[in-house]
Structure formats: C-alpha cells, structure tokens
C-alpha cells in the first residue's frame, strides 16, 4: 500500500457493537443462512472513482484478527458465550465475498456469503469508504478542526441546557460508519468522556481502549432476514423478536422499530415482548410522533413508560437531542445516539450519506420499509407488495 492509502482499520473490533451481538445470534441460530447486501449512496456523490482505493483497503482487511487482549476483554462481558468467541478468534474477512466496481461514476458494491461472516463487513467497510473519500477530497481537514467544531457546539449546548435538569440525559457515540477518520472519532469520543452525560460508544474498539460502555443491540438486517427465515411472512417480525430473546433473554433489549414501519411493529409488539424488552429505538420518521406512539402503546398495555427506555438515533445533533429531551424526559427514560454530526463535523467537509443494506436472504428478496420514504430499500416490487399486504400497510411509499 502507498502511504496515502495506508490501512484505515487496525482492529477487528473497530465496528459497531450490534454487529457482534447479531453475529453471535446468527452463529447460534442461523449458521447456514446465506445473504446478499448492497451499498447505497443516498446522496448525489459519484464515488466510483474511489473503487480501486476501496478495493485495496478490502484486501487489507483480511489480515485483521481478534487479538488476545481483545478476546479476554470480550470474554469478561456478560452476553458473549465461549463457543462464539472461540469461533470469532479464527474469523478472517474474506475479500472474495465483496465485489467493487465503478458503474458510470457510481460506486457499486455487493456482498454475498454466509450471514455469520457477511454480517461483519458493513460497518468497517462504510468507515473505510468514508475515510478514503475524505482523504482524497479534504486533505486539508484535520483532527484539530473537528475538535474546535465540537468545542463550539458544546458551548452552545451548555447555553441551551442552562437551568435544565440534565440528570436523565444520556448521549452515546454512534459515529463509526460515516466518520471522517478513525483518529477524528477517537478524539471526539475522548473529549465527550469529560461530560457527565456521555455514557458510551457503539464502537467496540474504542469502548475497550477507553474503558467505555459498548452500546448497541440489533439492526434492520435482523428483521429483514427473518422475512425469509420465517415460514410465515406476516409472523416474521414476531419471529425476529422472539429469536433475539432466546439469545439474550434479559439484556441487549432495545428493539428497532422501523424495518416495516412503527405502526406495523407495534401491532406485533404485544405485552410479552413489551414487558421483556427494555425499550425501543427510533431510526426514521418524525421522532416526536414516534415517541408519543411508543408511550401510548406502553400505557395501553399497562406498562409504566418510566420503566422503559426510548433511544433516538436518526440524524441527530445536540440541539435536536435537547429538544427531544425537553419533550419526553419527564415521562420515559431516554438515550440519544449521535453519529455523523459528531464524527464528521468539520468546516467545508460534506459527510457521506452511505449505507449497506441486506437485499437477499437464502436467495430470496428482503425489504426495509421504514417510516422515512427515502430509506425504503428493495429491488423486488412483487415482494414489497406481499410485505405490505402481510403487514396491512397503507399507501405505497416510493422506493429508492
């Protein structure tokens, strides 16, 4: 590798916590399931010119492995089992599972293989893409600028929260996948550690090295895959919720609600699930409307909302988090996950709006029909129609 293209990643744990949480569940429950996933740039960025540099980084990723000190640290956490961690010790990224091409200027990436392996590509690969693009586009930007921006926003944050009881305000770093760089994310997290309301990070490598609490449960792909794993499509979301509880009966219990819209989720989230899960995570749609629906649902089921946690993680910044805190803090426990607005917030730097999402499970289509129309993902229109019918969804939202 050239110096300019030095490896972005230095640890297998430089990923989001929920990837390992889901990987263990897949390892135990769905060892032989195969999946395919695709990269999407939601903006108008033409990233195809970076295909060669990204391919080079993907080749370098096969040399990452779980180190002994990392293995020991994971072993001390309460939710990982020895059989999974011993398997993870032997895990290596397989670059043959990833195809990268420049499609008329657009970056085209497809991943396929056993779910237990493919599941780990998404977050580090997105972090690689983000960092490589910013290396080329913004060579003048640096860590000091990111820190200066954060300091300025923390001054505004202090003014915004003056006189406000912040004892129930909890903020997490969710910024791995679209960070400007690994160095920027670490610097930002170290600074936030000085604040009493900062409670952890989704990044396992940072959590280990900085003695932080790792944060995360499951992602859309857990629910998407069950659309083909479950023999009954209409029951697939309940099957996903139940399988998660089998793996994690009394921990990691924050459920993601928007794989097939919040309303469809709540119809499946009956009193048993609502009692056993510790809370819910918002990732699309109007956050106030979502939170009100969640609280009303708990109350309808006879569950005290104060005993549950709502996690907000959709396109948040500090100001939005405070607005939501003011609205909800007296009625429910709250946590806020901020990503891009912390780890890629530098003057004259345009963050990338990039994702990698599941598109197939065992050779058949899966879909994400979230509460934000632009986040809908699926190639197969017939399957989308079947999914809408199975979950009794209203008007059709335009897929992208």
Curated annotation (Swiss-Prot):
Reactions listed under catalytic activity: nicotinate + 5-phospho-alpha-D-ribose 1-diphosphate + ATP + H2O = nicotinate beta-D-ribonucleotide + ADP + phosphate + diphosphate
Enzyme Commission number: 6.3.4.21
PANTHER family: NICOTINATE PHOSPHORIBOSYLTRANSFERASE
Record PTM: Transiently phosphorylated on a His residue during the reaction cycle. Phosphorylation strongly increases the affinity for substrates and increases the rate of nicotinate D-ribonucleotide production. Dephosphorylation regenerates the low-affinity form of the enzyme, leading to product release.
Full protein name: Nicotinate phosphoribosyltransferase
Organism, as annotated: Escherichia coli O139:H28 (strain E24377A / ETEC)
Pathway(s) it belongs to: Cofactor biosynthesis; NAD(+) biosynthesis; nicotinate D-ribonucleotide from nicotinate: step 1/1
Gene3D superfamilies for this protein: nicotinate phosphoribosyltransferase (3.20.140.10)
GO biological-process terms attached to the record: NAD biosynthetic process via the salvage pathway
Gene assigned in the entry: pncB
